[in-house]
């Protein structure tokens, strides 16, 4: 084989030939040892590697089961791309790298892999891993051998590889498009074209360029492991400027009971559809969304500050007084609770109910009525429940309250810094990278506040992922450890109240449009009718409130004021239909689009168009070219298989298999829709059931 392999690569604006090494021909003497340290125990070779594999799959039976295998691997090391076709070659190559760098005990080379969770399923049996850090079962952040440390660059960037390369300056090797047909079965002996090799080349070279760009502001020992690590570091630095912030943090220390209660109270965004307008194609639909919703709540609202105290609630008057004066959390039990008729979007999710009676009606996972239910709520959530529902009795247990006030100024200033930077750079093509960096940091600030302090440890052992359940004593020790750690600075309750305030503001928007609401999702509401003046009035009122509290929720850019927290009008829709949460299609300026959780937007819209358009967005409609896949995990020790006459080693693997997607509405949900919309067939069906 020639020393160099020709690769036809996709560059930023053109294609060109690039040259790679085959692993057996790589000149290891060109590698330079250069060690960087972080503390006593983190010692790394300065130059990281990037690694990727390409795989094929074959059926193992007639029931849709597959196994996958690697047919080529590629590495970029110190800017050089290297190919190999078999696992034994990879093992030998890595051993040679370790020898070339003359790594001593405790010294490691970092190997970045974009979506390490996929590659790890293949490599786990070919290396002796001493430490695997899994964020969830089969979700790998790092995996270490004595001299290698595999890291996930997807979790570092929070972007697809294509977007990571596209959004990073000084990158030349772009992610290939349609240069490699994944449906073709290839083996380690299958010849690859220069274009196919170029696709493989770019995957590791482009990623290497991204990592090296990031390392201009860091070194391999200091660079964060995740995207939120950057903003956590910035915010910690800002908060440490004021020693009083540490005192507030320690005074806010949670007991285990209080932490569990806050975990019960935590919810994400409110995503749901109006049962009166679900499963209907609606014309001339408007849309508003909240500008930078979560960051706005953090600069404008009052949050728990200081100790949480236990309170006894004996009557409604006491409850109302505490809920108005403090931030509160508690477990609420309601008897004979029922949604008011004029409320289009039910607020209480079944999934958050701690107890739920048998006599109940549930629409798309939301409570319409129940003979009783128990749920943990903040005072913000309780106010929304009180507006939406009527009930016969209420009981309040485990009531806790904390004094409230603005978040520390240093944290609010950091949020405004990112908002200003993002706003000033928006639309500036020359500074797109800085814009995306500021935007991602702005959006990440909320995320770091809701990191689970008592995250369950996932133990990886011989290919198995075991969730280690913490005892009560271990949980208490973990909480104590968190508050004693001088790097800790965030109050978990802040994140819980961020989302509660955001849901409150979304509820305000739903109140603005009333029964004209069609759909809402976290920070946006879609509706029929003309409500522009209503939203203008709401925005004016909100800005007056901010001015009164001396909250500056805007910046000036080129003579224009850009606000956080107000409702901005979006492009409307010619036609719109929803079948429930995370499930809708629309026509916008004549273009058909689709948003369905688990369904490819592009492929879904294309197939829906071929089926006949938006009116085929119906219950039981099957999408065959959905872009949806299922993951089939196969565990096996190292063994040989023969495919198309080629015998090679393989082991555990992961087959990604295409599957169909069927639009669904449950029978119960459909019954509710037909009843409230007064459809004829509902009455006929009801009468028939009575006869039977």
Feature names for model-found ranges:
Residues 48-50, 59, 65-114, 120-692:
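Conserved acidic
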Residues 1-49, 53:
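N-terminal accessory regions of nucleic-acid-interacting proteins
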Residues 56:
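Conserved Rossmann-like nucleotide-cofactor binding loop
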């Amino acid at each position: 084989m020639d020393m160099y392999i020709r690769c036809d690569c996709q560059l930023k604006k053109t294609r060109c030939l690039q040259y790679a090494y085959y692993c057996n021909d790589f000149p290891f003497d060109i590698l330079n040892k250069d060690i960087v340290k972080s503390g006593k125990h983190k010692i790394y070779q300065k130059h990281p590697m990037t690694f990727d594999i390409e795989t094929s799959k074959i059926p193992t039976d007639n029931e849709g089961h597959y196994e996958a295998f690697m047919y080529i691997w590629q590495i970029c090391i110190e800017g050089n791309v290297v190919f190999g076709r078999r696992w034994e070659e990879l093992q030998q190559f890595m051993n040679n790298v370790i020898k070339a760098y003359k790594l001593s005990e405790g010294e490691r080379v970092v190997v970045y892999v974009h979506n390490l969770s996929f590659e790890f399923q293949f490599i786990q049996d070919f290396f002796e891993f001493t430490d695997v850090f899994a964020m969830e079962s089969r979700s790998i952040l790092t995996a270490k051998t004595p001299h290698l440390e595999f890291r996930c660059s997807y979790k570092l960037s929070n972007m697809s590889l294509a977007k990571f390369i596209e959004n990073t300056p000084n990158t030349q090797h772009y992610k290939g498009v349609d240069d490699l047909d994944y449906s073709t079965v290839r083996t380690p002996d299958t010849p690859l074209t220069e274009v196919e090799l170029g696709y493989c080349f770019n995957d590791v070279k482009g990623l290497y360029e991204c990592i090296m760009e990031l390392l201009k502001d860091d070194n391999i020992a200091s660079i964060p492991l995740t995207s939120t690590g950057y903003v956590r570091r910035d915010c910690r630095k800002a908060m440490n400027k004021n020693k009083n912030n540490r005192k507030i943090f320690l005074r806010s220390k949670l007991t285990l009971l209080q932490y569990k209660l806050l975990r019960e109270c935590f919810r994400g965004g409110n995503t749901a559809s109006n049962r009166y307008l679900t499963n209907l194609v609606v014309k001339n639909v408007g849309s508003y969304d909240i500008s930078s919703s979560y960051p706005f709540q953090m600069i404008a609202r009052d949050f728990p500050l200081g100790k949480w105290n236990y309170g006894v609630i004996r009557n409604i008057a006491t409850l109302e007084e505490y809920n108005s004066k403090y931030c509160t959390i508690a477990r609420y039990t309601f008897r004979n609770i029922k949604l008011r008729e004029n409320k289009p979007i039910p607020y209480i999710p079944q999934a958050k109910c701690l107890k739920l009676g048998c006599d109940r009606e549930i629409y798309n996972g939301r409570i319409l009525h129940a003979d009783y239910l128990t749920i943990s709520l903040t005072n913000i959530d309780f106010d929304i429940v009180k507006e939406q529902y009527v009930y016969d009795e209420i009981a309040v247990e485990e009531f806790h309250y904390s004094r409230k006030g603005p978040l520390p100024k240093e944290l609010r200033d950091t949020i405004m810094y990112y908002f200003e930077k993002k706003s000033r750079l928006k639309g500036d093509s020359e500074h797109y990278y800085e814009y995306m960096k500021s935007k991602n940091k702005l959006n990440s600030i909320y995320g770091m506040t809701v990191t689970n302090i008592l995250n369950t440890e996932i133990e990886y052992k011989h290919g198995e992922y075991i969730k280690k359940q913490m005892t009560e004593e271990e949980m208490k020790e973990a909480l104590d450890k968190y508050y004693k750690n001088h790097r800790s600075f965030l109050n978990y309750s802040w994140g819980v109240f961020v989302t509660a305030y955001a849901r409150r503001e979304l509820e305000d928007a739903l109140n603005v449009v009333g029964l004209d609401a069609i759909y809402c999702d976290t920070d946006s509401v879609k509706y029929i009718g003309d409500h522009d003046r209503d939203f203008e009035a709401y925005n004016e009122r909100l800005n007056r409130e901010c001015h009164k509290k001396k909250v500056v929720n805007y910046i000036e850019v080129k003579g224009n004021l850009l606000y956080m927290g107000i409702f901005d009008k979006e492009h409307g829709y010619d036609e719109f239909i929803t079948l429930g949460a995370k499930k809708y299609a629309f026509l916008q300026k004549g273009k058909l689009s689709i948003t369905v959780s688990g369904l490819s937007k592009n492929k879904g819209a294309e197939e829906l168009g071929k089926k006949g358009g938006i009116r085929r967005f119906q219950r039981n409609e099957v999408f065959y070219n959905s872009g949806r896949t299922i993951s089939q995990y196969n565990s096996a020790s190292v063994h040989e298989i023969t495919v198309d006459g080629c015998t090679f080693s393989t082991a555990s693997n992961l087959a990604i298999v295409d599957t169909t997607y069927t639009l669904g509405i449950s029978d119960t949900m459909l019954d509710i829709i037909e009843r409230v919309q007064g459809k004829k067939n509902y009455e006929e069906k009801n009468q028939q059931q009575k006869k039977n």
